[in-house]
Structures are given as structure tokens and as C-alpha cells.
A protein has these predicted regions:
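An N-terminal low-complexity regulatory-tail signal and nearby short nucleic-acid-interaction modules
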Residues: 44-105
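Catalytic center-proximal scaffold of phosphoryl-transfer enzymes
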Residues: 1-37, 79, 83-474
């Protein structure tokens, strides 16, 4: 068999075994593997001719690569520095690995890696192992699959943390100089799901936020416009909203945008979220409100209360709800008091957001919110919560990050970028940026727009406002 300038000889017995389409397919795969090895060997020969000055070849070393066409055994040359003094261990180089970007100590090629990482966002690692074997791919243990998923998931988590630090620690723009979108209204829905933990802590909370620009009609159903998911394991609500804000800052300029935030009664949503968006409208998710009302006071009374609330009569709603305490059964008092406490603490969050928007937004198609609940169930709970699964902190963070990329249609592009060469550890890069910023005019640095500074009430936010001369009222 000839291929332009190179001649490759194959064992004719490969084709002699062909009896039908299935054996022909296997023969073609075998020929592809032979061709793969032959080309690699020729490339290794060419690299020997142009080896770096001061290096010498000390022999060949074998390694096995698992590819989409099967396992490939590669025998490539090892090079070391040609020094006179012999050291116990000399660090070597495989020029072939460097040229082809073959990852050290990792046997999977990129095509197979993409497949198993994508499958792992939907199936358990053991199920992925079984699926690959049944499909005729090389045997990959569930432990190796777990290792790859964890590695790339944590890389994505580090990249998100890097962006958060760039925006909130340094104050540097993270938009990559792209033209930012300026929608009149942006919708954010937040929720959390508890998953099992392998350590002392019984459960871990995966926080998830969905942002979209509204709805469009597609046939008889409505579809979210430009939905984006941010999900992960965070140390409190502040870290989540800072990470979320950093991701939004890559896409949007929210200076003149009304931000509608919908979520359940969790404090990290109702109390903390408004601190990060100057023009925020926060509402309690209607599903959770109606559900808790029905559980606490019954369906008939809940309906009457919602009629008062939908009419904009917040005070009457809360007063009537409070007056019902004497007739609430003892077994329902806990949920009733929790609901009443929330309604009295956040009365401004009870009205539907559509009742609080100005007349200038009436021409926009506005509908009820609740996408986050569906996203949590479909994207997180199905993979991470059901079937008695439990996770380490790093494992949960990695899986949530990859599920986020998968949901956003970014998983393959992320894997294709080989980000491990760019963001291994964000701290050294952070220190370099801090050093560089220290040589410049600090007044310019402090004038950078940071989402939290215009509406937050935390002490550190007030201090930064004072340093930078922000005009926002405290």
C-alpha cells in the first residue's frame, strides 16, 4: 500500500480474514492502527534528524495509547542532555510526545477523552466503562475515567475561580474586549440541590444559576433566549454570586439593565443576590410560595391569599396569613411559621416581578419563571443525587463544572482548548497581575466597574467605595 511519498507494507493476512461487512470493518480498523503506528515511527525518525543541540538519544521507550480505533503501542525515542558528568537521574524528553501534544502519563487520546467525559456527565463511571467496552472501544477502567473527569472538571473550576479573582480582587475586565450585550431585562433563576458527601459532612449543596434574556415562541411552546448555566460547589452565597457575576461580565454590560432574580427562600438568594446587581428585582419563586401556602393553610385558603397578593395587597396578605396562626394544626406549625417569617422579612419579594416593572417594559413578552428547578432536576439531580450516590468535595465540584459546560454546549470546545497549559494554578497569575497593577495609576484601577460595589452593604464593599470614590449611596 502506497501513500504519496511513503510506502507502507501490511500483512496480507489482515484482509484474508474478511468474510462479511463486520469482519471488513475490523480489518479496516487493524489497517488504521498499523498506519497510525507507521506514521508515528516515520515522524520519530524525522525528529531524530533535527534533535535539539546538546541532546542525545538514549534509546526507545514504549507506551500504549488508547484511541477511537483501538489501543496503539508507540515506541518512541528518549532524549537526554549530553553532559559529561553522569547523574543518577537525568530528566529526559520525548520529542514525539511534545510534537504531537501527547499528554504525559495519560493514555487516552483526545477523541476518546471527549467521548468518555461527555458520557460521564450523564452516566456513572462504571456505566461509561461498560458502554465503551460494549461499543468496541479500548478497555478503560472506571478509575481512569473518574481521574480524567475529575482532572478536567477541576480545571474548569479553577478557570472560574481565576475569573472571579480577576474581577473582584484585581478589578480587571474579564470580557476579552468583546462587544458586550445590553438587554433591557435579564432574568436570573437560582436554586440548589443537596448531594451525598463521602466525608464527615452529610451533604453538599450544589448551587446553580440560570440566566436568560427572555422567551421566544417556537411552535406551541416557549423557549428561553440565550440561556446560560453556572453551577458548582461554593463556599457560601458570596462566592457563588461573585463567580456568577464574573461569568456575566464576559457577556453583558448591565449598567442600564433590569435584573430579575427568582429563587426559593434561601438567604443566599433572597438576601445576598441583590448586593451584586444595582437594578435588581427579587421575587420568591411562585411554585415554592404556592406549595408552602397550600401545605400550611390548605388549598382553599391559599388560593384566597394568592388572590390578595396578585392584586398587589401585600400588607393584607401578610396580616391575614399571620392571623391564621391560632387555627393552624400543630403538625403544620413549623412550615407555617417559617413561611410567615419569610413573608414578613421580605415583603418586597412577594409580588410577581411583572407587577413591579415600569410601563416601558409592557411591550416585552413576559412570563412566569421557574426554569432553575427543571435545570437542577435534569442536569444535577439525575447524575449526582439519585441511586444513592455520594461525592468527595473535589469530585462534586468537578462534575458540576462539567455538567455546566455540557448544558451550555461548551464541553467539547473546552476540552479542545487544552486549558491545562493556561490555567494550572490561578494564584501565580494573580500575583503577577497585582504586581503589574502596582506600577500603574491606582485611580484608573479603582474606576473599573465591579458589580458588587453599586449595591452591596458588606463592610468590605463600603471600604472599597471609599477608596475609589464611588458615587453609590451607602
Amino acid at each position: 500500500m502506497k501513500n504519496d511519498g511513503c510506502s507502507i507494507v501490511f500483512d496480507s493476512s489482515v484482509l484474508e480474514s474478511v468474510k462479511d461487512i463486520n469482519t471488513l470493518e475490523e480489518a479496516c480498523l487493524e489497517i488504521a492502527r498499523m498506519l497510525f503506528v507507521s506514521w508515528i515511527e516515520q515522524l520519530d525518525d524525522e525528529l531524530l534528524k533535527g534533535k535539539p543541540k546538546g541532546y542525545k538519544c538514549v534509546g526507545k521507550r514504549k507506551r500504549t495509547l488508547s484511541t477511537r480505533i483501538g489501543d496503539i503501542v508507540v515506541n518512541r525515542r528518549l532524549y537526554v542532555k549530553a553532559t559529561k558528568k553522569r547523574k543518577k537521574r537525568r530528566k529526559g524528553r520525548f520529542l514525539l510526545d511534545e510534537t504531537l501534544n501527547i499528554r504525559p502519563r495519560r493514555r487516552l487520546t483526545h477523541g476518546l477523552l471527549r467521548l468518555l467525559v461527555s458520557a460521564s456527565t450523564r452516566m456513572s463511571f462504571r456505566e461509561v466503562e461498560k458502554m465503551l467496552a460494549e461499543a468496541g472501544f479500548p478497555q478503560i477502567s472506571h478509575g481512569t475515567i473518574h481521574q480524567e473527569v475529575r482532572y478536567y472538571g477541576l480545571l474548569q473550576r479553577q478557570a472560574m475561580e481565576w475569573a472571579r479573582n480577576m474581577l473582584f480582587t484585581i478589578g480587571q475586565d474579564v470580557s476579552d474586549e468583546r462587544e458586550l450585550k445590553r438587554p433591557p431585562i435579564l432574568f436570573i433563576e437560582a436554586d440548589g440541590v443537596m448531594v451525598g458527601h463521602q466525608g464527615d459532612q452529610k451533604r453538599l449543596e450544589i448551587k446553580l444559576g440560570v440566566v436568560h434574556e427572555g422567551w421566544e415562541q417556537v411552535g406551541k411552546r416557549r423557549r428561553l433566549i440565550s440561556p446560560i448555566i453556572v453551577a458548582g460547589l461554593f463556599q457560601g452565597g458570596e462566592q457563588f454570586w461573585e463567580t456568577f457575576s464574573a461569568e456575566l461580565a464576559k457577556i453583558y454590560d448591565l449598567t442600564d439593565t433590569i435584573v430579575v432574580i427568582n429563587g426559593d427562600g434561601a438567604p443566599w438568594i433572597q438576601s445576598i443576590a441583590p448586593e451584586y446587581f444595582a437594578n435588581a428585582i427579587v421575587q420568591l419563586d411562585r411554585f415554592h410560595l404556592i406549595r408552602d401556602l397550600r401545605l400550611a393553610v390548605g388549598a382553599k385558603t391559599a388560593k384566597a391569599l394568592m388572590e390578595r397578593l396578585n392584586a398587589g395587597e401585600i400588607r393584607m396578605f401578610t396580616d391575614t396569613l399571620e392571623s391564621l396562626e391560632p387555627v393552624i394544626p400543630e403538625k403544620k406549625l413549623s412550615i407555617y411559621r417559617k413561611l410567615l417569617s419569610f413573608c414578613k422579612k421580605y415583603p418586597d419579594h412577594l409580588l410577581d416581578y411583572r407587577q413591579r416593572l415600569g410601563d416601558e417594559y409592557k411591550g416585552i413578552g413576559l412570563f412566569g419563571m421557574g426554569a432553575a428547578e427543571t435545570m437542577v432536576d435534569k442536569k444535577i439531580a439525575n447524575r449526582m443525587k439519585k441511586r444513592g450516590m455520594s461525592w468527595s468535595r473535589d469530585g462534586a465540584a468537578a462534575m458540576a463544572a462539567l455538567q455546566m459546560l455540557q448544558s451550555n454546549g461548551q464541553l467539547f470546545s473546552w476540552l479542545d482548548q487544552h486549558p491545562e497549559n493556561d490555567v494550572q494554578n490561578p494564584l501565580p497569575q494573580l500575583h503577577r497581575h497585582l504586581s503589574a497593577e502596582g506600577k500603574e495609576d491606582f485611580s484608573e484601577w479603582l474606576r473599573v466597574s465591579m458589580p458588587a460595589l453599586c449595591n452591596g452593604t458588606q463592610p468590605w464593599i463600603k471600604a472599597l467605595r471609599g477608596l475609589g470614590g464611588f458615587a453609590c449611596a451607602v
